[in-house]
Regions:
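C-terminal alpha-helix plus adjacent terminal tail
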Residues: 1-53, 87, 99, 212-214, ...
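A structural preference for short, pocket-lining loop segments at secondary-structure junctions
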Residues: 50-60, 74-117, 134-147, 164, ...
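Short amphipathic alpha-helices within nucleic acid-binding modules
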Residues: 65-68
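Crotonase-fold acyl-CoA enzyme core
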Residues: 135-154, 158-297
Length: 386
């Protein structure tokens, strides 16, 4: 009887059809701010599976916390399409450069300086954004979100579109919408109720309070969690987070909550004095890729298609209406919110005076450029007050 290698040699076609949409390198679309790398796939014993690879799609904009520009979105669409049709690819690893951020969402500088006040332009941008999310949800290969740092706002949305999330435990998660002039309708309002339930989804999507990777794991957004901080040569859990007990004295769940007061400050000091090492994160990602390698490929794809349906159904039902609303919102609240984030500083803060705005709207004032300029001027004036 012929061996498997002999059968492959005799029956493989001499020419393979190229199913890529365009013959362009991913990096050429965005000046290298998205990288596409094929890394050798490995078995569980660490040996290389010859001719098979894992596709790494890497957000490479660390100076802006790996926020995505319009050109980066185009590159991501192409990258996921390329990985999806590549016969040699086992799994996709979606991550960011460095250890500070996986992704913090859209590029607020671009939002504030180009899209604010231009709803017709932002509507076209959101077509690209929607296609990016759909390309993740429609990828024929399992997609692993390697959370190397904070996953916030739109970064949380594209992260939740992935099939698996493995995070280092210094990373924070959360939404930014109503705090910065938007609503989390780029996927979060579709995915969160499915993934963590309506009540917790409401908390995350409206209050926009960041939460720890440990809490993300408790809620069910993260399937794999590893320490990243080394102190004295040994890995330790995130010292700003409660990890040594499940309940407080009243029986309330506190595991994964941030510490407070002096304990939190001590944790920050410990992080500052330690060393960040992502080797355990990489090992966990490789382990998952190896497990995925040892499955029937078409059965894997079908399983992905079926298990994605709850997220995909909600996404497809809402994405076009969301695109229209987000475009129009660029004339008022988004225009103010993104400008505040872009023009504000650590000293002034990056949020407008919400109470003043609400007081004005309660009296029926219309949205105008003058109102927005006034909100920004009041924000910047805080510098002198402080």
């Amino acid at each position: 009887m012929a061996t498997t290698d002999e059968i492959i040699g005799k029956t493989a076609p001499s020419r393979l059809v190229d199913h890529n949409l365009v013959d362009r390198e991913v990096e050429s679309l965005c000046g290298g701010m998205v990288r596409y790398e094929k890394r050798p796939a490995k078995r569980r014993d660490g040996s290389t599976a010859e001719g098979l690879f894992n596709a790494w799609i890497v957000l490479n904009n660390p100076k802006q916390y790996n926020s995505y520009t319009t050109d980066m979105i185009k590159a991501l669409i192409l990258a996921f399409r390329r990985a999806s049709v590549d016969r040699e690819v086992n799994a996709v690893v979606f991550t960011g450069t460095g250890d500070k951020a996986f992704c913090t969402g859209g590029n607020t500088k671009e939002y504030a300086e180009y899209y604010a006040g231009n709803p017709q332009e932002y509507r076209q941008y959101m077509r690209l954004f929607n296609d990016m999310v759909s390309s993740i949800l429609g990828c024929d290969k399992p997609v692993i979100c390697r959370v190397n740092g904070m996953r916030i706002g739109g970064g949380q949305e594209i992260g939740m579109a992935c099939d698996f999330t493995i995070a280092q435990d210094l990373a924070n998660f959360g939404q930014a919408g109503p705090k910065h002039g938007s609503a989390a309708i780029g996927g979060a309002t579709d995915f969160l109720p499915v993934m963590i339930g309506c009540e917790q989804a409401m908390v995350s999507g409206t209050l926009c309070e960041p939460f720890s990777a440990h809490k993300a794991a408790r809620l069910g957004i993260v399937s794999g969690l590893v320490p990243a901080l080394k102190i004295g040569g040994s890995f330790v859990a995130n010292p700003t987070v409660i990890t040594d007990r499940m309940l407080d004295e009243y029986g309330r769940g506190v595991h994964g909550d941030f510490r407070t007061g002096a304990a939190y400050k001590e944790g920050l000091a410990a992080i500052k004095g330690g060393e960040v090492d992502l080797s355990l994160l990489d090992a966990a990602v490789e382990e998952l890729c190896a497990k995925l390698l040892e499955t029937f490929p078409e059965c894997m794809t079908k399983s992905l298609e079926e298990l994605r349906k709850p997220k995909l159904s909600a996404w497809n039902a809402n994405k076009e209406n969301s695109r229209a609303w987000l475009a129009l919102n660029m004339m008022n609240e988004a225009r103010a919110g993104f400008r505040a984030f872009n023009e504000g500083t650590k000293e002034t803060g990056r949020e407008i005076d919400f109470v003043k705005l609400r007081q004005g709207l309660a009296r029926g004032i219309p949205w105008s450029e003058q109102l927005i300029d006034g909100l920004i001027a009041a924000l910047l004036a805080r510098r002198s007050e402080r």
